[in-house]
A protein has these predicted regions:
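Generic structural signal for well-ordered alpha-helices
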Residues: 82-83, 107-114, 155, 180
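Active-site mouth loops of central-metabolism enzymes
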Residues: 64-76, 141-148, 167-169, 191-193
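Divalent metal-coordination and catalytic microenvironments
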Residues: 8, 22, 27, 50, ...
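N-terminal metal-binding scaffold of metallo-dependent hydrolase/deaminase domains
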Residues: 1-40
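N-terminal small/glycine-rich loop or linker at the start of catalytic domains
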Residues: 53-67, 130-141, 175-179
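Divalent metal-dependent hydrolysis catalytic cores, especially in the metallo-beta-lactamase
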Residues: 63-65, 80-109, 123-135, 162-173, ...
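Histidine/acidic residue-rich metal-binding segments in metalloenzymes
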Residues: 148-198
Length: 198
C-alpha cells in the first residue's frame, strides 16, 4: 500500500521541515516532497497530527537489552530479544556487542550474528567486538584476564563474519600495526578504544 505521511515535523538533511510529505510505497520511502506536491493525492493519506518523523537510529554498541546481555548468551534468540527491546526506542539497525571474552565465546557470538542476519532478524547489521585487545589501564568493566595480543587465528576470527559488518574496538598500542592493517584489508572497521595511547 502506498501512503503519504503528512502533517509531521520531518527531519531532513536540511533540518526539521513542516511543509513536506513522505511518500512510502511497500514499506520503503519513495520520496520526500512538498506537502502540496501533486503526487501526494495519488497516495493514501496518513495524518501524523504534527508528530515528529525521524529516520531510524543505528546503534553501533548494543551490549544487551530486554533483560539479556549478549556476552551471557551469544545466540540468535538473545539477538532477537535485544533487537525487540531497542526497536521500541527507534533503533532500526544495530551491532550486537561482545565485550572482551574467551575465543570460544567470540566464535559463538560471530556465528550467532551471521545466523541472525541470514534468518532476517530485524535490524542486525553486523557485530561489534569490543576487545579483547585493550589496555589494562583503561579496562573499564572488561575482565583483563581475557585480554591478549591478537595472533593470526584472532585476525581470521575477527574477520570471519561474511554477511554483515564487523567493528573491532582495540587499543592500538597493544596490537601490532601489521595486524591492524590486515584487519582493515579484510574489511574490519577498526576503532581505537580503551586505550592508554597518548
Amino acid at each position: 500500500m502506498a501512503t503519504a505521511l503528512v502533517n509531521a515535523r520531518v527531519l531532513t538533511a536540511d533540518g526539521f521541515r513542516d511543509d513536506v510529505a513522505v511518500l512510502v510505497d511497500a514499506g520503503v520511502i519513495d520520496a520526500v516532497v512538498a506537502a502540496d506536491d501533486h503526487r501526494v493525492s495519488d497516495f493514501d493519506i496518513e495524518d501524523l497530527g504534527g508528530d515528529l518523523l525521524l529516520p531510524g537510529f543505528i546503534d553501533c554498541q548494543v551490549n544487551g537489552g530486554g533483560g539479556v546481555l549478549f556476552n551471557d548468551a551469544p545466540t540468535v534468540a538473545t539477538i532477537r530479544r535485544i533487537g525487540e527491546a531497542h526497536r521500541r526506542f527507534g533503533t532500526t539497525g544495530f551491532l550486537p556487542t561482545l565485550i572482551s571474552d574467551d575465543i570460544d565465546v567470540m566464535r559463538e557470538a560471530i556465528a550467532a550474528v551471521g545466523a541472525a542476519i541470514a534468518e532476517g532478524v530485524p535490524g542486525v547489521i553486523g557485530i561489534h567486538l569490543e576487545g579483547p585487545y585493550l589496555a589494562p589501564a583503561r579496562r573499564g568493566v572488561h575482565d583483563e584476564t581475557k585480554f591478549r595480543i591478537p595472533d593470526a587465528d584472532d585476525i581470521a576470527l575477527a574477520s570471519s563474519l561474511r554477511n554483515g559488518r564487523t567493528l573491532l574496538t582495540l587499543a592500538p598500542e597493544r596490537v601490532p600495526v601489521d595486524s591492524i592493517r590486515e584487519l582493515v584489508r579484510r574489511g574490519v572497521i577498526v576503532c581505537a578504544g580503551h586505550t592508554a595511547a597518548t
